[in-house]
């Protein structure tokens, strides 16, 4: 996948840049914008349409939509195509995690129309009345979403969301830097690779891997089990098992042979593997997390019609085929998922490696060993946050 852009992407990563024809702005998780549009030398706000976040009603002037999602999570040619087709300017910004997105929303420092959070965060946003129900009459491509991705626990009546991607969390490891294939979450807590291990910088995934290793559900509401998991991570941290924690940093360090083991997502693994075939991916024997990221519209969105147009465009079969090919995350669009192997062969003149395809679109027997994160009661969210803060105090 992404064979056409593989060399360009590799060079961009090596230079520490994300090169594109479209403007994508990264947001400072401490609040506000980072001041520059990624892939540009132009300060945000100077002659670039992606630099403003003022919103627009879409009537009597330029139409626009502001989208917040994760980094390197879209084929940017789709942004340009949507703009060309509709005349709607897309202000596309990125944040590193669900927790940072939530924090920015709470601070009131961002005003998105569309966001693309993960399942458990969607549940929380619905519970706290952040989202508005969608007008599915404006999203005819919702019919193309496979039934198994509808009416899930985070949106049981399917009032607020259109799935964007799905995938799994696992362990990525460098086969030249470990003594044997990894099969268990034990690798994340063992001294065997001390100083050469990274974990994801959010409490849900970090404590989740410990809960799974201990044999508990990632959705446990037992405070003692949660504290045991936090203590396991803290002990490994104190023993020097971890080189550190991160999000985008994990991608670059693993791809560059600079760390042996990390927890990360299947789609990102496949992007790394494209440039480093020393890497392997495993769903540990104890199980893992499978997730859905979905498109939602904020209750106070300023560009509601434009937001619906964007969601419908991104739910189309063509957009899903191209996006799946670019970002390596599986599509919830049933047609795209079924067509992809044949589409790939037509695009690149060779068969798709089905082993890689099954990492991207995990078969049911793998998903049966995984759990989706469910929203936790407020008191447990507070406990997670407190334990996470204590860990790095």
What function would you assign to each model-found segment?
Residues 18-21:
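C-terminal motif of bacterial Sec signal peptides marking the signal peptidase cleavage site
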Residues 23-26:
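Bacterial signal peptide processing site
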Residues 51-124:
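Early extracytoplasmic/lumenal segment of secretory-pathway proteins
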Residues 68-75, 111, 116-258:
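Extracytoplasmic ligand-binding site segments that recognize negatively charged/polar headgroups
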Residues 170-177, 211-215, 291-304, 311-314, ...:
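A bilobed periplasmic-binding-protein/Venus flytrap-type ligand-binding module shared by bacterial periplasmic
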Residues 227-236, 275-299:
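Periplasmic-binding protein-like
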Residues 298-365:
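Mature extracytoplasmic/periplasmic domains
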Residues 360-393:
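Conserved C-terminal helix/tail region of periplasmic/extracytoplasmic solute-binding proteins
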